[in-house]
Amino acid sequence: MKKIIVSLALASVLLSCKSTVATSNKQEEVKVTIDLIDVKDDKVQVTILAPKINSDQITYSIPKIIPGTYSNDNYGRYIDDLKAFDNKGTLLEVKKTDENTWTIPAAKKLYKITYLVNDTFDSEKGAGFGQEDIFSPAGTNIEVGTNFMVNMHGFVGYFQDKKEIPYRVSITHPETLWGATSMIDLDSKNNSDEFVVSRY
């Protein structure tokens, strides 16, 4: 059976971070799940389990600029339907403060964030990279049955003052997809991959 390639282009954000191995000591981390199985309307769902937050409010941001391109690409414009929940599944208030940032006032209650990601390839209209279009190698692509280009800065953001803690990223996918990445997959299953990095 022909293999379908899922391109996990982790270079921009996560590849620049040091890989780490899981330890037996429980430590603070951000847990991320990217669902490449249940794709609807060309959008991928991302779930972020929040670390312990002691502040009264917290911001969650998707990058505006990434190393290597240095253009104002505003990856937050590709995020839809961002929601925050407490540990009982109750919706928390979320305020979008700019194109790339969301503020959660009841931060101490925050358990998880969910949102949908659109890909950048579909939005390229020939306006030019650094204008309205995003430089393709730094972009994201969602083509069910063909490929996914998962540049992490287009899928995963960061909490204010929490960029220096580890990230555990789990990607669920059909068994016919395999990930092309230089990172070490800590999950041996055929339908999921897991990567751990020391910081955002």
Show which residues each predicted segment covers.
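Surface-exposed beta-strand/loop patches in extracellular or lumenal glycoproteins
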Residues: V44-G76, V156-P174
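Bacterial Sec-dependent N-terminal signal peptides
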Residues: M1-E29
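Non-catalytic, glycine-rich low-complexity segments
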Residues: V21-D38, I48
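A surface-exposed beta-strand-loop module
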Residues: L36-I37, G68-I134, F159
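Extended, low-hydrophobicity, Ser/Thr/Pro/Gly-biased non-transmembrane segments
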Residues: T114-Y200
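A short, structured loop/turn motif at beta-sheet edges
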Residues: P51-Q57, N87-T90, P105-L110, T172-T176
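Short structured motifs
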Residues: V30-I34, Q45-T47, T97-T101, N151-F155
